């Protein structure tokens, strides 16, 4: 075990606001600075590294470039492309696929008209408007759909194997619509300089917020593991140093559990501490000197005696012993 740091007891979920596409997750307590450190890492991974499904390109009969217009269709090709970028999919398929649509007017072409030929995917925002086709028009369109991560520009979706008239589209694969990070102060015992990390995660519905958080955490863990398993030239020295830190930590924990009655104190001091319900060294060092002086029959002579007793043990009044306290 490496030197103990304050770790969050668990991740809390705000059940009042939780839905299939939104979740508020709260981690506390964290050491000062770790709210931003962990929160930024989670936010970046959530927004850029989770897999998703998106349209990679289209081919429309009679259209040979992306700046064309289509007879009988109100929207031009650039506007249709912009609308298709917004289509959100739910898919467990790991390969790319193509679906062909033949649309005859009059018709309002909606995202829900994009149907998988073999059930490879499902459109989530079915009511999204794509184009308006008048009564005299008919349009045949091939839609290419792929899996990926984050954002991929149209240039990277072009390849030599595509048919003539293929129009590449920017692919927004990420299933995450928004991530908001908030870091607040929180208290542990008497110490107030710990942090609470709050992550508001909004997805497109293709993945639950819970699964998104879990997947992002695993991605970070997989990367950090390489550093945790790193073996430097001075590995033996590092291990010995960590071992020494662990021993010091355990020794301090045991020392703080020492009963007051086991200390060589005067009867007066023993009685004062007993009346104040101070039973262990942990209880004693967590008090300030001015607090002790407020107890009945507790004077400066007793305070001096206790101060000297603590100094012999390498302790003092007003210590923060949160990290040494047993959990549970």
UniProtKB/Swiss-Prot annotation:
It catalyses: RNA(n) + a ribonucleoside 5'-triphosphate = RNA(n+1) + diphosphate. GO terms for biological process: DNA-templated transcription. It comes from the Bacteria. CDD domains: RNAP_alpha_NTD. Keywords: DNA-directed RNA polymerase, Nucleotidyltransferase, Transcription, Transferase. The keyword Heme does not apply. Its EC number is 2.7.7.6. Homodimer. The RNAP catalytic core consists of 2 alpha, 1 beta, 1 beta' and 1 omega subunit. When a sigma factor is associated with the core the holoenzyme is formed, which can initiate transcription. Belongs to the RNA polymerase alpha chain family. The N-terminal domain is essential for RNAP assembly and basal transcription, whereas the C-terminal domain is involved in interaction with transcriptional regulators and with upstream promoter elements. This is DNA-directed RNA polymerase subunit alpha. It comes from Chlorobaculum parvum (strain DSM 263 / NCIMB 8327). The lineage of its organism: Bacteria, Pseudomonadati, Chlorobiota, Chlorobiia, Chlorobiales. The gene is rpoA.
């Amino acid at each position: 075990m490496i030197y103990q740091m304050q770790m969050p007891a668990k991740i809390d979920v705000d059940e009042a606001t939780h839905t299939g596409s939104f979740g508020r997750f709260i981690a506390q307590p964290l050491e000062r600075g770790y709210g931003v450190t962990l929160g930024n890492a989670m936010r970046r991974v959530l927004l850029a590294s989770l897999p998703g499904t998106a349209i990679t390109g289209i081919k429309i009969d009679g259209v040979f470039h992306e700046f064309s217009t289509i007879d009988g269709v109100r929207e031009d090709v650039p506007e249709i492309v912009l609308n298709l970028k917004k289509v959100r999919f739910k898919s467990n398929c790991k390969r790319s696929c193509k679906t062909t649509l033949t649309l005859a007017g009059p018709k309002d072409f909606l995202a829900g008209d994009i149907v998988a030929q073999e059930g490879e995917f499902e459109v989530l925002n079915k009511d999204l408007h794509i184009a308006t086709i008048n009564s005299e028009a008919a349009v045949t369109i091939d839609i290419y759909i792929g899996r990926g991560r984050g954002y991929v520009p149209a240039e990277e979706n072009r390849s030599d194997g595509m048919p003539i008239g293929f129009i590449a589209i920017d692919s927004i694969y990420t299933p995450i619509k928004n991530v908001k990070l908030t870091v607040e102060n929180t208290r542990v015992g008497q110490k107030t300089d710990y942090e609470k990390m709050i992550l508001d995660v909004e997805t497109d519905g293709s993945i639950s917020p819970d699964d998104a958080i879990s997947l992002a955490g695993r991605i970070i863990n997989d990367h950090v593991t390489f550093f945790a398993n790193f073996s430097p030239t001075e590995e033996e020295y590092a291990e010995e140093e960590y071992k020494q830190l662990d021993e010091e930590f355990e020794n301090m924990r045991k020392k703080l559990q020492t009963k007051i009655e086991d200390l060589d104190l005067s009867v007066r001091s023993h009685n004062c501490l007993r009346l104040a319900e101070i039973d262990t060294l942990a209880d004693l060092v967590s008090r300030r000197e001015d607090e002790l002086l407020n107890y009945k029959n507790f004077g400066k002579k007793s305070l001096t005696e206790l101060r000297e007793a603590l100094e012999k043990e390498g302790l003092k009044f007003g210590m923060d012993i949160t990290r040494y306290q047993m959990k549970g």
